[in-house]
Design a protein with these regions (language model features):
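Hydrophobic alpha-helical transmembrane segments of membrane proteins
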Residues: 1-77, 92-229
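Short helix-to-coil transition segments within interhelical loops
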Residues: 81-87
Length: 229
């Protein structure tokens, strides 16, 4: 695994529009962190509800998908197309890179949520509910980051549908309708987030192997890269 990860990090430097993609990744991560901190200040006033509880986390999780995008774009190169690296890039290396990036993102979100919950004990339950949503989103994004390069339109429709479903679940959770079993203990909430990360990583690897022979979707890449497909 370590060998694959080192090669993946070397390869992403040669991805399509690498500098611009890294810049966008940093912007998403920074915006997500700022939104998380702003959300905390709103929660202190007792005004935050709905998607405001997790929008910062969504931005942070989105930033974790960009390295995988760069990695898979390297498989468009002619030399890679004719080498044994192509399958590894689109399957095991992509799944491992996504797992690492998602782990980093989830750990940062958990850190922010736990720090806030420890400082403001009365809001700990609110933060743990948000971690439950984070776990659902990390599972969804993990699978999306594999399927999108093969079935672009279908994957967009799927992520929109399930994002709306998570929003409905959050409204049910925050509206006081959910049974107590859904309001997890802090350790269980953290464990759930990491558990969904692991489940998503395993499923994404299996899916990547299942759809490997499917041609990459032109719509999933910019115009310059699409011409190489």
């Amino acid at each position: 695994m370590k060998k694959d990860m080192m090669k993946a990090f070397k390869l992403i430097r040669y991805g399509v529009m690498a500098k611009g993609t890294f810049l966008i990744m940093v912007i998403f991560f920074t915006a997500g962190t700022v939104l998380e901190l702003m959300g905390f200040s709103v929660q202190m006033e007792g005004a935050q509800s709905g998607s405001g509880r997790y929008i910062g986390s969504v931005f942070i999780l989105c930033s974790a998908m960009f390295p995988g995008q760069l990695l898979i774009s390297t498989s468009l190169a002619g030399l890679v197309q004719t080498s044994s690296y192509k399958k590894r890039i689109q399957t095991s290396m992509l799944a491992k890179l996504n797992m690492f990036c998602n782990f980093t993102a989830v750990t940062w979100i958990v850190f922010l949520r736990l720090v806030y919950g420890l400082v403001y004990h009365e809001d700990m339950a609110e933060q743990m509910d948000s971690l439950l949503l984070t776990g659902l989103f990390v599972l969804l994004f993990n699978l999306f980051s594999i399927i999108v390069y093969k079935y672009f339109v279908a994957s967009i429709l799927i992520i929109v549908f399930f994002s709306m479903a998570i929003q409905v679940f959050d409204n049910w959770l925050s509206g006081g309708y959910a049974p107590a079993v859904f309001h997890l203990h802090p350790l269980l909430a953290v464990g759930f987030s990491y558990g969904m990360l692991i489940v998503g990583g395993i499923l994404s690897y299996w899916i990547s192997k299942a759809v490997y022979k499917k041609e990459l979707s032109r719509a999933a890449f910019g115009a310059a890269a699409a011409r190489q497909i």
